[in-house]
Design a protein with these regions (language model features):
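Mature catalytic domains of secreted/periplasmic carbohydrate-active enzymes
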Residues: 1-447, 456
């Protein structure tokens, strides 16, 4: 690819388009109506990190001497100088990948959008790329797994998104340069581990060394390539796009994305923290949610496992949430004007773990009875009732919440109010205090609590 020409094309689109790379212009981009109808999405963390089956930050931590991952790697694969992270790529085969079967499972579970990881922090692209040879079409699976999933998502009428975690690659493999490993200088643009810079405080907006123009230009091109190749209607970014050095490139990308997708029904960017000024895109809370309902759209992304986003066989990582807890999260998030992006970590052979499939089947069973209280609903004047308090903010799902039969979540549609009991009453009786006599409520049916019990 001629990188300079591609940059010129990007800037030309922004110059001629409706949206320009300024916060003022980008703030005029509306959230499309179709996104307002979404409630449940499927997040897919797949990649080279699925092979060691530890967790999704294995590529970073295996290069930190003394870490559990380093010790595990040395014991099972040898020293990083002899067997580095890149040497897992041939084992990431996806030979049993059946995108149609995946999409059917997701659809039956009530999901209406899919967000696969296009590129994680490790720098391996799960799609066909002209910007790097380190991609799934040329290595590992030798197939465009993003493209294959897109075809099936469109067939099933689901919305395809994509996530990019590329910007964290600036420092993600940097610890590999602190000792004799396979990550060595000199490295250049296009090398797998490049740039492997020192990791300072990765939550600091102004941490140094600052990402260079060369790296950020490459980041911009990679993001635009995803847009041009797959036209994802949702683009999810991880947190480090909030870094001050990224902001001008983020503006250029957002303008390009909005302009390209304008004729395709619009698009949405999910972001964290203050990466965008409020009103541009949809804010996301990782492994957490709001305590109260919000007048704006938002998203909670979480995983079916507490200790990992990717496939793992480690006892302390592969701790699955109960299906009941996942449904409780869905009810809580939707009642507060949110969307739930639920993550699964496929195996490196392209199959889903038995526990993943079991959870999807349980969700499907629950949705067959209770879908009408989720999809097509909106906020009622009261969204919740009960004694159990929700801890607001990110990384708050370390333990299950002890909901009681006095806890309810409310949604509404048309003239209907839906009350979902978050735990089953021992005596089979429900006491809903928010429904006063003045509300003139007609009780048609109460079903949600019955199937919620069967999810345990």
């Amino acid at each position: 690819m001629n990188r300079e020409r591609y940059l010129q094309e990007i800037d030309a689109v922004n110059a001629a388009g409706k949206y320009h790379p300024t916060w003022e212009s980008l703030s005029t981009h509306p959230v499309p109506d179709w996104y307002r109808e979404k409630r449940l999405g499927i997040f897919l963390h797949w990649g080279v990190f699925s092979v060691p089956a530890y967790h999704d930050w294995y590529a970073r931590n295996m290069y930190i001497k003394g870490s559990p991952e380093y010790e595990y790697h040395c014991q099972h694969y040898g020293q990083p100088k002899d067997f580095g992270f890149k040497d897992f790529i041939p084992q990431f085969k996806m030979e049993a990948f059946d995108p149609q079967a995946w999409v059917n499972l997701f659809r039956e579970a009530g999901a209406d959008y899919i967000v696969p990881v296009a590129e994680h922090h490790d720098g391996f692209q799960n799609y066909r790329s002209e910007l790097s040879h380190w991609n799934a079409a040329e290595m590992g699976p030798h197939r465009d797994i993003m493209g294959d999933l897109l075809v099936e998502a469109e067939r099933a009428g689901m919305t395809l998104g994509a996530s990019s975690h590329r910007v964290e690659h600036w420092w993600f493999l940097g610890h590999g340069q602190e000792f004799d490993s396979d990550i060595k200088q000199p490295m250049h643009l296009g090398d797998y581990a490049w740039p492997a810079m020192p990791e300072r405080e990765n939550q600091d907006l102004f941490s140094e060394p600052m990402p260079t123009d060369e790296f950020l230009t490459d980041w911009l091109l990679r993001c635009c390539e995803i847009v041009d190749r797959y036209h994802p209607r949702i683009l999810y970014f991880d947190w480090w796009i909030q870094h001050s050095a990224v902001k001008p490139y983020l503006q250029r990308f957002a303008a390009y994305y909005f302009n390209v997708m304008e004729s395709r029904g619009g698009c949405v960017i999910n972001y964290k923290h203050d990466a965008f000024p409020f009103g541009i895109g949809v804010p996301d809370i990782e492994r957490g949610q709001f305590a109260e309902a919000k007048p704006f759209l938002w998203q909670s992304d979480t995983s079916v496992m507490r200790g990992s986003w990717c496939y793992s066989v480690q006892p302390d990582k592969a701790v699955y949430k109960a299906p009941q807890e996942i449904v409780q999260d869905l009810l809580d998030v939707v009642s507060k004007n949110g969307r739930l992006l639920l993550n699964f970590g496929p195996k490196p052979d392209g199959t889903l773990a038995d526990k993943d499939v079991e959870i999807l089947h349980k969700l499907a069973d629950w949705m067959r009875v209770n879908d009408e209280c989720i999809h097509g609903t909106g906020l009622w004047r009261i969204n919740q009732e009960g004694p159990t308090k929700i801890q607001e903010g990110q990384f708050a799902d370390g333990a299950s919440r002890n909901f009681t039969s006095e806890d309810f979540r409310f949604t509404c549609r048309g003239g209907n109010i839906y009350a979902a009991c978050m735990a089953c009453p021992a005596d089979g009786k429900l006491h809903i205090r928010s429904l006063r006599e003045a509300d003139a409520v007609s009780y048609t049916h109460l079903r949600a609590h019955e199937t919620l019990a069967n999810l345990v």
